[in-house]
């Protein structure tokens, strides 16, 4: 029996998911084609696409938006199990926008039936992840899952965006080296007040979660650093979604270890955006789908 944390298990899972992803994409496309231009489904989907074009890149088209929705539908049950009780999905505007479109899709009986046919598959995956009881184990699984998931289920996205994840030992080396360089060149540490840190391509959040876990941030500086001096950008919608949950979960665990409280603290430094497009628009966006 394959263990949940093994590459073999997630490789097999992502091969199945490639077929399932194709079915979801076909179904979503069919429902949108069948919907009248004035329908609620078409309206909320158009708002969703507009929001992506404004926040990410004007070149985002309906097909890419459909792929993003398929990613959300396929992996959400897995991460719901892995981060049970997490409040991110209740509060994050991007998550709410995605779920709003999904809710309108679920109103269609054929779509709901297609989803029900996968319930046994999702239950088996959820059973495998529910016993992951610490952030390190979850990060390991997330990295392997995403590596295999995008390569097999969404190869065009992986090729287009160059999705490759840095091994954790390399991440740790880079973070420690940055701290040493900062001390030697500027007399500051990553923990010091006024030292802001941005991860322009956050992926699933490994750099920031390891920063919080390695002890490079002093306990007395944790809350300030997390709430005011840490920032992360991500262009892949589902990576953004998972990175935020991952970072918030790790911060909660580290804060609790240091006696800083156990209440949920959202990571407000997380932004869904194209880092290379940041200088192209500075005006405030009023997007109905992402409120």
Predicted region positions:
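SAM-dependent methyltransferase catalytic region
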Residues: 137, 149-291
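Non-catalytic, mostly N-terminal accessory regions of nucleic-acid modification and defense proteins
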Residues: 1-169, 251, 255-265
């Amino acid at each position: 029996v394959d263990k949940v944390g093994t590459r073999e298990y997630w490789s097999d899972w992502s091969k199945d998911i490639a077929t399932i992803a194709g079915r979801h994409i076909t179904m979503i496309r069919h429902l949108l084609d069948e919907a009248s231009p004035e329908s609620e489904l078409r309206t909320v989907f158009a708002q969703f696409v507009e929001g992506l074009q404004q926040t990410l890149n004007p070149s985002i088209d309906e097909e890419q938006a459909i792929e993003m929705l398929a990613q959300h539908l396929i992996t959400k049950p897995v991460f719901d199990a892995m981060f049970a009780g997490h409040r991110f999905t209740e509060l994050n505007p991007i998550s709410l926008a995605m779920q709003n479109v999904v809710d309108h899709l679920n109103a269609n009986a054929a779509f709901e039936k297609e989803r029900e046919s996968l319930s046994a598959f999702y239950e088996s995956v959820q059973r495998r992840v529910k016993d992951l009881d610490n952030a390190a184990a979850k990060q390991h699984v997330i990295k392997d899952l995403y590596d295999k998931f995008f390569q097999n289920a969404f190869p065009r996205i992986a090729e287009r965006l160059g999705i490759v994840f840095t091994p954790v030992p390399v991440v740790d080396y880079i973070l420690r080296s940055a701290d040493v360089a900062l001390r030697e060149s500027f007399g500051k540490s990553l923990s010091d007040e006024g030292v802001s840190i941005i991860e322009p391509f956050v992926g699933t959040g490994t750099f920031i979660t390891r920063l919080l876990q390695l002890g490079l941030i002093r306990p007395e500086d944790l809350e300030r650093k997390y709430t005011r001096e840490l920032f992360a950008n991500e262009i892949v919608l589902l990576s953004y979604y998972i990175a935020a949950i991952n970072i918030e979960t790790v911060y909660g665990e580290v804060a609790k270890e240091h006696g800083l409280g156990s209440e949920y603290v959202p990571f407000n430094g997380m932004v869904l955006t194209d880092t290379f497009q940041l200088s192209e628009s500075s005006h405030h966006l009023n997007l109905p789908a992402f409120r």
